[in-house]
């Protein structure tokens, strides 16, 4: 479970406040204009930013003031942050131990995750030898080996071409189902949101302006669809 109660934060003179309740295993997309607070919301959940006030429960534990390393979350950004001098196997292994001192059990887990994301034949390669999609797969694998119940994605596939982006979304969808992960994914693409999440949050000026079915935004039946440039089917 993920629960935010009046979590506030001041960003460049824009006061933000978030109230949110997400059930275990739920997949939620986060949309909204640039600068509205989408990435800030994820950073608050991950612990990279400290809220001014409020209360946060992650996995039924109070993590309002916990440092990032102690939170039950993994986060993947648009920039994959792979180390160029390390192999794919070593980059993934950093998710298990910063010094890469892995036990036999951890090595087996790494091999299993690499197979899940389709990188079992690339483990001895350097990031420069991978395609853009493979690099994002490696970054995703590094998140998954941590075995945390909450996965945060901050536009990690936006730089990929449509075919690769769709491939990665299908992979994330399958991984979340298999591992029963709770997912929050920031995107600027409503179609991507619809592929992976039945529920969408629309962030506007530091507030959750819409919390409801993704499909209602797609077909314009939600009045707030106009924020995304979609003509609303609602007659006022």
Curated annotation (Swiss-Prot):
Gene3D superfamilies: P-loop containing nucleotide triphosphate hydrolases
Membrane topology, from the record: Peripheral membrane protein
Signal peptide range in chain numbering: none
Matching PROSITE patterns: ABC_TRANSPORTER_1 (PS00211), ABC_TRANSPORTER_2 (PS50893), THIQ (PS51288)
Cellular compartment(s): Cell inner membrane
Subunit structure: The complex is composed of two ATP-binding proteins (ThiQ), two transmembrane proteins (ThiP) and a solute-binding protein (ThiB).
Protein's recorded name: Thiamine import ATP-binding protein ThiQ
Species name: Yersinia pseudotuberculosis serotype I (strain IP32953)
């Amino acid at each position: 479970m993920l629960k935010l109660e009046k979590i506030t934060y001041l960003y460049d003179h824009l006061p933000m406040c978030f109230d949110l309740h997400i059930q275990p295993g739920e997949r939620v997309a986060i949309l909204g204009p640039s600068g509205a607070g989408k990435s800030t919301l994820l950073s608050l959940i991950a612990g990279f930013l400290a809220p001014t006030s409020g209360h946060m429960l992650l996995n039924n534990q109070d993590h309002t003031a916990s440092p990032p390393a102690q939170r039950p979350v993994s986060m993947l950004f648009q920039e994959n942050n792979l180390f160029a001098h390390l192999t794919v196997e070593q980059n993934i292994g950093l998710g298990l131990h910063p010094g890469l001192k892995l036990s036999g059990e951890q090595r087996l887990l790494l091999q299993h995750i690499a197979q899940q994301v389709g990188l079992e034949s690339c483990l001895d390669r350097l990031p420069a030898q991978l395609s853009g999609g493979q690099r994002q797969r490696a970054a995703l694998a590094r998140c998954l080996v941590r075995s945390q119940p909450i996965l945060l994605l901050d536009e990690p596939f936006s730089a990929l071409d449509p075919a690769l982006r769709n491939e990665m979304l299908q992979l994330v969808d399958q991984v979340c189902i298999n591992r029963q992960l709770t997912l929050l994914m920031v995107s600027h693409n409503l179609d991507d949101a619809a592929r992976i999440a039945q529920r969408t949050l629309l962030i506007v000026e530091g507030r959750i302006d819409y919390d409801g079915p993704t499909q209602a935004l797609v077909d314009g039946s939600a009045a707030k669809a106009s924020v995304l440039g979609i003509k609303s089917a609602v007659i006022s």
